[in-house]
Regions:
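Glycine-rich phosphate/diphosphate-binding loops that line cofactor/substrate pockets in enzymes
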Residues: 84-99, 124, 201-202, 318-327, ...
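Histidine-anchored nucleotide/phosphate-binding helix
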Residues: 108-126, 343-354
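Conserved, well-structured core segments that form the ligand-binding/active-site neighborhood
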Residues: 160-324, 352
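C-terminal catalytic subdomain
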Residues: 337-431
Length: 492
């Protein structure tokens, strides 16, 4: 069990190996400096940080991968994707009952719907296959959405997750563990709750499908999150999200090893080993033509497939900038973003790159309310996005907010903490509504003419009036941060 470094001069390989051992400990790990993951211009310190950020910590179990394909420079071909799925299905052996768990319509860019249809086609001839979209706290998908995302799967094959009344509690992550991973910031247990469909279906295999991508609560989304949050219960979602908010999203986004992932990994390994879980994880990136392409596909039964894909996420989905941005304009596709609960990804994913005193303009023509859930919508309207200190103070005054910690976490995440301006141009919210929750209002129709998404490219743009902006066409595809600040944040 040792670290092997290849692809460079022997002297550099030996020196880098010692640095890696000091940073992550002795473990079975190969670092090929000839791989696109470790570009020639990276220093040894940057390579060590990249490995550490991927979650390869001292004593960590890497797990196994059933099937995978990866290409940092070119998108995977249809044949390569088909080969991986064929290998996965073959490795499962005979199965009678299979549950597929893809993300819902709010993750349409993940490519998971196509993979779900492909797996259904491979399995349905010999097995009873059902599909449970991982709604989390989101509203249920409509028939039109189901037909649009999963055209080849009959509607009677779909199940609906109810995070309030449709869950089973398996056990709980003890308070002592939460206290440890949060460095003493929190001292409560987190119940392990999953959809009752998982525990009562007599499944031979449960396959979770989704995209690995930087995320504000867990660091890198999907894998165990798709199961234990996407099909989780209210209290488990509340407490895990609040843990992320209290620990600070800026120290976690884009990181593979975070307190929230520690908690969800504990659930998977210690509290739910009886669930026959497998994972299908993608890594995707938008190409020069604006098409979102799959560059990595990893299948396995434990954290091995997640850890295999995490370095590629950091290579392709972290947009690290040399200097802070004065003005950022983010567009939210109305087919995907209909609430600030989802649309505030515009804030989460760009905040680390925005200059003090800078400006964020959010173009959300399809946004019609604040919360996905009526109760959470009511809490957002009552308390607004007014920063960490205000939200924590309100927790002591409002029992309803204290009983909905995921809403409190969202209020914290959705504030700039007064560091930069947020101008929200919501298509179906009034000026009074937008300003009542602490944002500056902007006219969506005027700004869509000024910043027409079809005329802008991702990144820096110069406008005819001389204005310079940084444009993001879909905040759900990555994280924008400063290179120096990101390198200095803790890898865990």
């Amino acid at each position: 069990v040792t670290i092997v470094v290849t692809g460079a001069a022997a002297e550099r390989q030996a020196a880098l190996r010692q640095k890696l051992i000091r940073r992550v400990g002795e473990q079975q790990l190969t670092v090929d400096l000839g791989s696109p993951l470790y570009a020639a211009e990276l220093s040894d310190a940057e390579i060590v940080e990249r490995v550490a950020c991927a979650g390869l910590r001292r004593g960590e179990r890497r797990g196994t991968v059933r099937a995978s394909a990866e290409n940092a420079e070119q998108a995977l071909s249809k044949a390569e994707v088909a080969r991986v799925l064929d290998q996965l299905v073959s490795s499962l052996g005979p199965v009678r009952r299979v549950l597929l768990i893809p993300p819902d319509a709010t993750r349409a860019h993940s490519g998971a719907a196509e993979l779900t249809c492909a797996l259904y086609a491979r399995l349905a001839s010999t097995a009873n296959v059902r599909v449970l979209p991982a709604l989390g706290t989101h509203e249920a998908m409509s028939e039109a959405q189901l037909r649009g995302l999963f055209p080849s799967i009959p509607l009677d094959r779909f199940l609906v997750h109810d995070f309030r009344d449709g869950v089973s509690q398996l056990s709980e992550v003890p308070a002592s563990f939460v206290r440890h991973v949060s460095d003493g910031k929190l001292d409560y247990a987190v119940p392990c709750q999953v959809s009752r469909e998982l525990t009562t279906g007599d499944w031979d295999r449960i396959i979770s499908i989704g995209q690995l991508v930087p995320h504000e609560v867990i660091g890198i989304a999907n894998h165990v999150k798709n199961v234990f949050v996407g099909t989780g219960g209210k209290e488990s979602i509340d407490r895990s999200h609040f843990l992320g908010a209290v620990c600070g999203m800026e120290s976690m986004m884009g990181r593979a090893h975070t307190p929230v992932r520690d908690v969800l990994n504990y659930m998977s390994a210690q509290l739910a080993p009886q669930l026959p879980l497998s994972y299908v994880c993608t890594v995707r990136k938008k190409d020069a033509r604006g098409q979102i392409q799959t560059h990595g596909l990893y299948c396995g039964d434990d954290e091995g497939c997640f850890l295999a894909g995490a370095p590629l996420v950091q290579l392709l989905n972290l947009n690290l900038l040399e200097a802070p941005l004065d003005k950022v304009v983010v567009y939210l596709d109305p087919r995907e973003f209909r609430t600030t609960w989802l649309g505030n990804k515009a804030i989460y994913r760009t905040r680390m790159a925005i200059a003090d005193g800078g400006e964020l303009v959010i173009l959300g023509p399809g946004v019609r309310r604040f919360g996905e859930d009526p109760g959470i919508d009511r809490l957002i309207r009552r308390h607004g996005y007014r920063g960490t200190r205000h939200t924590l103070a309100e927790l002591g005054q409002d029992r309803e907010l204290a009983a909905s910690l995921s809403a409190a976490a969202h209020l914290i995440h959705g504030s700039s903490e007064g560091r930069f301006r947020v101008r929200w141009a919501a298509g179906e919210l009034t000026r009074k509504e937008v300003e009542s929750v602490g944002y500056e209002w902007a006219d969506p129709f005027a700004l869509l003419r000024c910043y027409a998404p079809a005329t802008l490219k991702d990144g820096f743009n110069g406008l005819p009036n001389g204005e310079k902006i940084f444009f993001v066409s879909n905040p759900g595809l990555g994280l924008w941060a400063l290179k120096d600040d990101f390198a200095r944040t803790p890898s865990a």
